[in-house]
Amino acid sequence: MQNRIYWNNSNNNMQKGIALATCMAIVMGLFTGCGNKNDQQIAASPDEVQKGRYVETELSLPEEWKDKNISQIFRSGDELHFLVAGGAEGQVSLEEWMLGEGDTLTEVTKDWLKALPDGKGLESRDSFTLLQDAEGNQYLYGNCYRDEESSSAHLWKEADGSALDITPQKWLEPMDMDGYRFYDTPQYVTLTEDELLVGLSYFSLDVVLAQDGSLVSSQESDSLTDSGSLSDNKWVSAVGDTLYLAQADEQGNVNGLLQMQLDGNNGAKSKGEIPFSQDSYSSAYFSVLGDGTVYAADADGFFRCDAGDTNWQKLLQGIDTGFSLSDQWCRDIVALSDGSVYAWFGSESGDKIMIYRYDPDAVTEVTEELTLYTVEESFFLQQAAVQYHKQHPEILIHVDAAISMTDKYSGNADYQQIYQDLNTSLTSGNGPDLMVMDHLKLDTYASKGLLLNLQEILQPMEEDGSLLSNITKAYEETDGARYAVPLQFGLLLAVGRDVQPEEMSSMDAIAKAVSRKTESYMGDRTCGELVEEFYPLIVDDILQNRQVNRDTLRPWLEDLKKIADNCGILPSRKEGRAANIWDLGSDVKLVLQETDGFNEAMMPYAVAELLNANVVSMENAFYPKMVIGINSRSEHVETAKEFLRFALSEELQSVDTYEGFPVNAKALETQAAADRSMAEAYTTYDIDGSTVEFAIKSYSEETANHLTELCRAATLCLKEDTQIETSLTESLQAYLNGQASVEEAMDAVEGSLKMYLAE
């Protein structure tokens, strides 16, 4: 089945990545192609001081907002307005505020809005949108989700100083889809100059009369685009009689801004398109001025497209904005005619309003630029580069990712080609300053003298207890040198239903346990899937003195055969996937779960609670994450060292980016004690043929402390070698099918690795 999931969080940036990582239906790069984004400012010569640029500052919010939530930022006339929600549960109060000269905030709430909440059972966390027509009449839309049994939509209009409910009947009537009851309620609403309210939901674009809420037209949202779909944030804006909607490609990246014309009862028709190329981990946000000028922002920067044009000018680099930070997420942006742009960010510490204004006297400060190469796109690394630049404005760290999150989780990554390309770059002297080398054979780089010894950085931090030395010493050479260090790590957890902890604490224990069972405990597997799951346990020991270590290989093969006999080996997988934690309630009894951090651990522990299952750390094993090294030939070695110290610091590592546990000891304690309520999610789960509601909720303090101890006790580093994995997969098919002996299997492995060992 396809599980529905509802996140108790508006962190679009991070959830876009999580969606790929967990296959849940929710969560950097350069802009290319049509609608190119060009730097607005002409580059100065090296001897010139370049003046004039956009500058980011934070708006100071009034003390009266301390216990309230911003529900909306919007433009009224040519002034920035805020809708703020507060008050006790079930008796929410709404206030309208205006930003004036000197960035002062003044309350301008009309009487009808003050009287609105009586008896409505609203909450300050609900989503509200305030709209105003040319005559000053106001309308309020509330999206107030409570449960699947009632509609979340409410639409009121100002009428003689009080609120008149004009919610369209369509939004109040339940719909059925594959047995699920739901309401097709708008995520965004906007108001046209003709006093038509337009609501955009996941399924439809509705046009209603602002006068009484009667439905004028309704059309499927999928019909609005010729290719792709509307973007995830379901944004719509009206300027004059033109609607603007963001279109996305199959990966969810915005690739165009659609311009639609309302045509009476026929709904919206295409009027034009402003191309917008995006390959960024964050959602894109837009604001359209009355003259048709469009402002856009995402993690790559701030951009402007003049009215009637289709080319975008870059106003500010993404690294100089809050959009590049993974511990906060944008809710909306608003541009004014003077060129200033305001961005509303949410964070665990509350709302933030960032201001972007052009300062003709501001000087570009960057004097040193470094490149941080990473095999895989990463929130943590982007956060590190942004934060370091904020502390050191004269230094800019460019993060260059070989593989986007989309490619990583689609299985399109060619790590061997990436390894060869990086090797060529390093040996030619054109390599990056810092490298994150996950999935690559970094021993090769170290043996060629291409990596700097990091011992002088790591040893003092380990000796004073700043780092988890059980993790950071994973790449220590026999002579004590260290050419790489993991910035984060994941735990290998085994989750078993009707399986005792001691029966899944190691590969050997699993092999013994399942060999006594007739029922398949892990579900059928192909040879490659089984090898992929278990080969990291021995990859570091399988080769010794450029020969296959048969003493290590034999017991691993014998255990693998026992597990294969219980699973059942498929010749190939033509459809579907190998069983995972979503199948523990029905098809399998045991799964291995790579768990990358405290937030990610909510999933296996929630499943265990739901199924009364057990969770253990398998073999005290960990996956090294973001294994970083410094190019010994870099012209910026000292700066690279300082950046690495910063990347290992408590300050940076205390934020959980869903990519791993921190190697900083104090950050580990900070994350363990963190409030995880914003990461909670609600979905459904299959148990023995029945579908039940499933809450992925924060676990207890006891569990958090237990996870901390597992992190401190982890000793077995699970490394990767794609060549060894391929050789094992090619060599073991006959053995796992019972057509070859263990001796023959070892001979086949040796033969397959002969050329690899000769390199």
Report the location of each language-model feature.
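C-terminal motif of bacterial Sec signal peptides marking the signal peptidase cleavage site
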Residues: 29-33
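Extracytoplasmic/periplasmic substrate-binding proteins
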Residues: 558, 562-645, 650, 655, ...
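Short, well-ordered beta-strand elements
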Residues: 365-378, 395-402, 434
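Repeated scaffold domains used in trafficking and secretory/extracellular systems
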Residues: 66-75, 119-133, 174-191, 225-240, ...
